[in-house]
Amino acid sequence: MTKELPKTAKAVVIGGGIIGCSTAYHLGKLGWIDTVLLERKKLTSGTTFHAAGLVGQLRTSANITQLLGYSVDLYKRLEAETGLGTGWKMNGGLRLACNEERWTEVRRQATTAQSFGLEMQLLTPQEAFDLWPLMTTDDLVGAAFLPTDGQANPSDITQALAKGARMSGVSIFEDTEVLDLEIDKGRIRAVVTAQGRIECERVVVCAGQWTRPFAARFGVNVPLVSVEHQYIITESFGVPSNLPTLRDPDRLTYYKEEVGGIVMGGYEPNPIPWAANGIPEGFHYTLLDSNFDHFEQIMEQALGRVPALENVGVKQLLNGPESFTPDGNFILGEAPELKNFFVGAGFNAFGIASAGGAGMALAEWVTKGEPPYDLWPVDIRRFGRPHFDTDWVLTRTLEAYGKHYTMAWPFEEHSSGRPCRKSPLYDRLKAQGACFGEKLGWERPNWFADLFANEEPKDVYSYTRQNWFDAVGREHKAVREAAVIFDQTSFAKFVLKGRDAEAALSWIAANDVARPVGSLVYTQMLNDKGGIECDVTVARIAENEYYIVTGTGFATHDFDWIARNIPAAMHAELVDVTSAYSVLSLMGPNSRAVLEKVTGSDVSNAAFPFGKVRTIGIAGCPVRALRITYVGELGYELHIPIEYATTVYDVLMAAGGELGLFNAGYRAIESCRLEKGYRAWGSDIGPDHTPIEAGLGWAVKMRKNIPFRGREAIERQLAGGVKKRLACFIPEDADAVLLGRETIYRDGKRVGWLSSGGFGYTLGKPIGYGYVRNPDGVTEDFVLSGAYELDVARERIPCKVSLSPLYDPDMARIKA
């Protein structure tokens, strides 16, 4: 007897692959038993049935590593819970290094694993061979082994998750295609299928490569692309079942044991997109035609590593499309465009490894309104305007696929889809030697080459100090001793206006924004746990109007957070004005002298002190000047209507020549902010860190009886203390290269890892920031009393610790 579709549900999950089934399983575990999963055809029939099934855990993010580790823990127990086999085996994962640069990368990965509490053993070529005797090792420098990695049967795990979901009361319907969604006032109300209509509170779209076109029908952007992905399955030739999985990135290949044979695939540099104009009707349990010519480049690499493959029969060259994303990370979370519409898609061929944790996190997001921990690297709100364009997404995604196994260089930039968004100054800066990076489509000058000295404005990547090190040093010196201009046009800029603007922003912002017109406030915006969701500058430009500035990459995220947290009864409207203004940041001890030469406005310290915003005129152009800095010097952010930008820039450069005015880029900003101790959202601070833990308690209005979101959590921390605290670390080895994720040791015990790292040119030393953790509590005395070391690429380096800024701790230069 066919089960009848329910009329109502708390949540409807669309898609019956491993991600959808994991999400449904975890929704059931959280008590949402009136959850319904709808699959257009059969469970696993989209992509899951042809996935390779390798399960690795280590990523560059601690929380994504934790999420993948949860998958492993779930897969270990799932068979016992459901009675269904999963094919899970924890045979470990081996990663090879065939040159010194890759070996440095692997050693840094081992440090990262150690930081995150994941075991990773460094091996000699002989030790690697002992674990994987099918391979040649003549070119090996070393290898790494993660004993808790493994492999699984994707279809079996999915069926086990589906059974577990049913055991909790979740209903699953196959052959039930979703035809439409009913939406009222920007919120999901119902799901419509051929079998009936289901009223629901939440929709979770886990439809794999169908997700982008489906979501687009409702105004939701999910930037992913279907790409052909091939691997071979060999005949059995006596391969032991406990053989570890193997990744050989220098040869672009991966391997796992399969019924006494081998599965071998790889990531070619010239991938083939699929179904760019739409997925064909009836595409389920379907594979693409094998492309032997295209796979030949992977096969040649594999034969060089595993010569036995030359004499083994191949059962199948399997070609199945997988969904990939522009940055190689999957996509989770509630869509900023539509309330109650959640997404879990774009898993870049590591969906099996991710599924357990992704389903858990997505279920918590659905039921509690937020994920269990900060998932910014995979948050759907990390995308922006360029990601609406299918051609741009395709171009960037193919580049990301091709880099899957290439060296993961520090500071590496994408080259595809550029230039996309350009400041009005782009051509001028390019002609003056700018080497551009890209963020959210914006071209941003990272550093400037000295063209007169025949420097080339091009990054040369390495794990040592890169070719731009001295150039950034010149810019840093100019910031500290003269003046520079940073083109920061890419800043995201919003206006909040309306009769309740002050009341709304007072609720959202942790700092006091109820200040007079002309005031400028640095503030965080907190979640209910006190975690930092946004880190912004707020200028009050009129009685009922605020101008809000945030980082380039946070445009979608921060706009969504602010808009969602405006209390429903309040009259306040948020508008994105990013493209209306250019931003020239004039910074350095000579910045006021430069400004005085080009404006008739009084910019003296008395008339225009730190923390204020003024409208001034420059060459007939109206300029909103913000007296603020992110480099630790006297300075001004000049926000200029975009049509005036080149005029203002030219006037400033002409006036500043005799005062040492210099072009400078984002890498100089980074080195200066490290010296001054400014925090960076996404690394040093985020939803898992409170202002108290981050040393930003001074920016929270606890002395005023003003309610704001997160206040109760901050009160609890102030009363009970914290278990982690952000500190600054200065290695004794001036040549150490700090990149972030280096392990922090206090008195020989691992207590954390660096959240960010770089070099301070004024100090002449590397600088790192990271949280010192202790389950029994962390006080200032606890931090300052320890003897510290940093593990850098598996070498311990003694270092000093500080809780105060290393540069201008009294802020005398900023307030001059």
Where are these regions (language model features)?
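Dinucleotide-binding Rossmann-like beta1-alpha1 core, especially the glycine-rich loop
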Residues: 53-131, 250-255, 259-261, 282, ...
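Glycine-rich FAD pyrophosphate-binding loop
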Residues: 28-49
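Beta1/beta-strand and adjacent pyrophosphate-binding region of the FAD-binding site
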Residues: 4-19, 36
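Glycine/proline-enriched, intrinsically flexible loops and inter-domain linkers
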Residues: 373, 380-816
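Flavin (FAD/FMN) cofactor-binding and adjacent substrate-gating region
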Residues: 74-77, 89, 98-174, 179-187, ...
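Flavin-dependent oxidoreductases
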Residues: 22, 62, 180-289, 297-308, ...
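Central beta-strand plus flanking loop segment that forms part of the substrate or channel wall
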Residues: 52-57, 93-95, 209, 218-241, ...
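C-terminal catalytic lobe of FAD-dependent flavoproteins
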Residues: 154, 250, 259, 281, ...
